[in-house]
């Protein structure tokens, strides 16, 4: 009787991994042919022939009680989703509705979903990275890093397919790491994933402080009819400035001269509206309460703003390049007064930025699950990376080439290229305001992801209590405030966090998993070992280069 009372839709355990979904390969429902359904009622009576077939399913269920997956019914005997019925011990059958299945996207939607996910704050630092590496070497590094990260992402995507006799349809990359390396693999992937998320939140805090400062400054100057002239900048309608020409690049503000009705008003405003001394603390009042929301579904509605902001940035870059023209002069190894060499030893700073700019490895499996044509996953992933790489090249090359040298030196290009335009620039003001609102809605989403990953692993609950969540949020916000106060250089923050999380999730873990999988199948060759070992060394060198270059 105990055997008969077991539900026919019971899940099949597979070692330490347990799947709890309606996937037909994992769940073993009872199938009733349409001709064996008697009547058209909501609860349709099952014929005697169907009842006999039910007994066979009971027999299979006894076999599948074993941990050996080979005793499970073969996949080809499981009917298609639209023909599945669930048999009840009461003698009734219910048709499984397909409405709860995830919507599959065409390839074009999948490609732009990947593009939109990768287009983050790193795009603002690409021109600065090209300046650090040199114009020619910078372009080469963008192409090479795009190819390397694409291959590693391909290895992540294929990692679930190389595991035999286990249903991996709902697995993520941390599950794959746990399968191959146990608890160490799972926790290491989790820690480095948190590094990338918290690093992004710190960059967001610095940028939001920057955008709020410049937005408030624009409004104040407009209301009080104050004209500011930066001491270091070009003349003309399309002004470009050099905020830190001869001072510490992590200083608080650029040199500005006020002219208006009341100079003391401007000085008082600067005292209470400081980019590093006050603005980072003002943001606490706005963002800390938002982080404590139990659900982030409200903020998820504004994710489309990311696409709009990137499109506007592309328009802004194109317009500025047309207005300013190109200013290039090639010096291959020696610098001049206004230009940098084409090849510089600071190139690891660009590779660190690009590691995060091309980083999507921790969620690529999830994104590709919704692709309508799974056989095109590799092609769509490659096209998405091509689109991302072209976007970075377009923005980086145009800003670097259009930067007016002379009279300004290329060394003046800031880690956030919007800082090279005065706060009075209307088009840049629109970009800053738009990005400020967009980041205000995305920041709680990032905090929610940090909470889900960390609290879910430690407490088994995404919201164990208000106190736990509040302490975590205070820690994350505190990290952002400290960086915005003492080190507001988003280029360096991005490159350090990118190189650190990229070492594990981009270079080491995908390569090790692929080599271990080949070794277990007896297919590992010395050429594969050499190539993937070289990738691991590149990841280590990329991280070390951030500290020594």
Swiss-Prot record:
Disruption phenotype: Homozygote knockout fishs for the SLC38A9 show no morphological difference at 12 and 24 hours post-fertilization (hpf). However, a quarter exhibit pericardial edema and small eyes at 48 hpf; the abnormal phenotypes became severe at 72 hpf. The overall body length is decreased at 24 and 72 hpf. While mutant larvae with development defects died at 4-7 dpf, those normally developed have the same viability as wide type and exhibit normal fertility.
Chief location: membrane
Gene Ontology CC terms, in alphabetical order: late endosome; late endosome membrane; lysosomal membrane; lysosome; membrane
UniProt keyword list: Amino-acid transport, Disulfide bond, Endosome, Glycoprotein, Lysosome, Membrane, Metal-binding, Sodium, Transmembrane, Transmembrane helix, Transport
Disulfides per UniProt: 242-412
Effect annotated for changing residue 82 to A: Loss of L-arginine-enhanced L-leucine transport
Sites carrying sugar chains: 227, 235, 252, 263
Regulation: Amino acid transport activity is increased by sodium. Transport of L-glutamine, leucine and tyrosine is increased by arginine binding.
Membrane topology field: Multi-pass membrane protein
Transmembrane segments: 108-128, 135-155, 187-213, 272-288, 298-322, 345-365, 383-403, 426-446, 468-488, 496-516, 529-549
Cited InterPro entries: AA_transpt_TM
UniProt motif CARC motif: location: 432-442
Protein name: Neutral amino acid transporter 9
Organism: Danio rerio (Zebrafish)
